[in-house]
From Swiss-Prot:
Top-level taxonomic group: Archaea
Gene3D superfamilies attached to this UniProt entry: 2.30.30.520, 3.40.50.40, L-asparaginase, N-terminal domain
The keyword Protein biosynthesis appears for this protein: yes
Family: Belongs to the asparaginase 1 family. GatD subfamily.
Gene for this chain: gatD
Organism field: Pyrococcus furiosus (strain ATCC 43587 / DSM 3638 / JCM 8422 / Vc1)
Keywords: ATP-binding, Ligase, Nucleotide-binding, Protein biosynthesis
One of the GO BP terms on file: amino acid metabolic process
Domain Asparaginase/glutaminase: 92-422
Function: Allows the formation of correctly charged Gln-tRNA(Gln) through the transamidation of misacylated Glu-tRNA(Gln) in organisms which lack glutaminyl-tRNA synthetase. The reaction takes place in the presence of glutamine and ATP through an activated gamma-phospho-Glu-tRNA(Gln). The GatDE system is specific for glutamate and does not act on aspartate.
Annotated catalytic residues: T102, T178, D179, K256
Protein's name according to its UniProt entry: Glutamyl-tRNA(Gln) amidotransferase subunit D
Length: 438
């Protein structure tokens, strides 16, 4: 029996507060919570309720011995806040751009449902603390999961960001899903030229309906960083699992390193720019960050989308490289093993790619450390084949950078020169011991 039919027979509607008695291994277990809408991808035979602690559980219909309504759902029209507050002259003004993701979610407490369509306006209204930091101009660009983000979205975000910065805003906060936030941060780092004010990407590992949500604190800290002196593209997220402080990471050196921890984001081969406390304290951890200044920000949005990111693995077939070349790809970023190696039998296909005008770049799947193709014979053969070693760049950053580079040149010598030029802090001069696993 499907859940819709089951609930209808029992006279139960989504949003009702119910008590369920379930039989598990001969024992009765009791749950109370709000009936949720059926999940789109569920089998349709499970009743989902939101417990009082905020978490959802699913109970198979066949295991439900008894289900009773404790309180009927209260019909209530949905409210959309516009966050139209009188500007305060003593506060700076920033723009919050909404793009989607976990931070852009809200709970309807009458039905228990969690909606991903939490607009930037509603998000701002839900965290009133940010109005004590700055005047907020919220704007929803789109509402998509970050895994659906494409280069065209990066370009739109870049233009909207530059527009906001050039129209009197002191900074921009971008609400973004966490899964591909590093890619977007890197793309903005290369596309936003002459950056004179802060651009801060922020997200949440846990949605706003969960007791352990990091959404509010992350947004508060991001807003504080957006009115700071650091004129860089940054990612601001929790610095540790508790609600102690957030960290501001440089946009080209940051990576999501855990699927679910609140402090999942880490600076790789670099130290963060700053620690931020929600009460307003900011501790800069380095002094070489780009400082706030005057001048117009402009967007360099030329991107070559026919670029691939390929991870090397034992037994990898050279046919994969050949396929990309045959399909007209202009660039390939390889995540090599160790210092930047591939199986030896890939080298002829890599050389063919370079000979046919494809830019082939090498990063390391170790993430930490630096590519060095001069140490072992395989690396030297790759160099001879024309592979560009990408120093200590993250694979994702190198992928985005190569798209940007090939948007400007088809000449492999010029492409190599540009890939090895440090435009946005993506390359550090040398590897510091204190940047490993921080």
């Amino acid at each position: 029996m499907r859940v819709e039919e089951f609930l209808k027979q029992k006279g139960i509607e989504v949003g009702d507060y119910v008590r369920i008695i379930k039989v598990e291994d001969g024992e009765k277990v009791e749950y109370e919570g709000i009936v949720m809408p059926p999940y789109e991808l569920s089998e349709g035979d499970t009743v989902v309720i939101k417990l009082d602690n905020g978490y959802n559980i699913g109970i198979a219909i066949e295991k439900i011995q008894e289900i009773n309504v404790i309180e009927k759902a209260k019909a209530k029209p949905e409210v959309h806040f516009k966050a139209e507050l009188e500007p305060r002259k003593e506060l700076p003004t920033i723009t919050i751009l909404g793009t989607g993701g976990t931070i852009a979610s809200r709970i309807d407490y009458e039905t228990g449902a969690v909606y991903p369509a939490f607009t930037a306006e509603e998000l701002a209204k839900a965290v009133p603390e940010i109005f004590e930091i700055a005047n907020i101009k919220p704007k929803l660009l789109f509402n998509i999961f970050s895994e659906d983000m494409k280069p065209k979205h990066w370009i739109e975000i870049a233009h909207e960001t530059a527009k906001a910065l050039n129209s009197g805003n002191e900074g921009v906060v971008i609400a973004h899903g966490t899964d591909t936030m590093g890619y977007t941060a890197a793309a903005l780092s290369f596309m936003l030229r002459n950056l004179t004010k802060p651009v801060v990407l922020v997200g949440a590992q846990r949605s706003s309906d969960r007791p352990s949500s990091d959404a509010a604190m992350n947004l508060i800290c991001a807003t504080r960083m957006a009115v700071s002196d650091a004129a860089e593209v940054m990612v601001v997220m929790h610095g540790e699992t508790s609600d102690t402080y957030c960290l501001a990471h440089r946009g080209t050196k940051v990576r999501k390193m855990h699927t679910s921890r609140r402090d999942a984001f880490r600076s790789i081969n670099d130290i963060p720019i700053a620690k931020i406390w929600s009460d307003g304290k900011i501790e800069f951890l380095r002094d070489d960050y780009r400082k706030r200044s005057e001048g117009e920000v402009w967007v360099d949005d030329k991107l070559e989308e026919k670029v691939a990111l390929v991870k090397v693995y034992p037994g990898m077939s050279a046919e994969l490289i050949d396929f990309l070349v045959d399909k007209g790809y202009k660039g390939i970023v390889i995540e090599g093993t160790g210092l930047g190696h591939t199986p030896s039998d890939l080298i002829p296909s890599i050389k063919r790619a370079v000979d046919e005008g494809v830019a082939v770049c090498m990063t390391s799947q170790c993430l930490y450390g630096r590519v060095n193709l001069n140490v072992y014979a395989t690396g030297r053969k790759l160099l001879k084949a024309g592979v560009i070693p990408c120093e200590d760049m993250l694979p994702e950053t190198a992928y985005v950078k190569l798209m940007w580079v090939l948007g400007h040149t088809n000449d492999l010598r010029e492409a190599k020169k540009m890939m090895l030029t440090n435009y946005a802090g993506e390359i550090t001069p040398y590897t510091k011991p204190n940047t490993f696993l921080i």
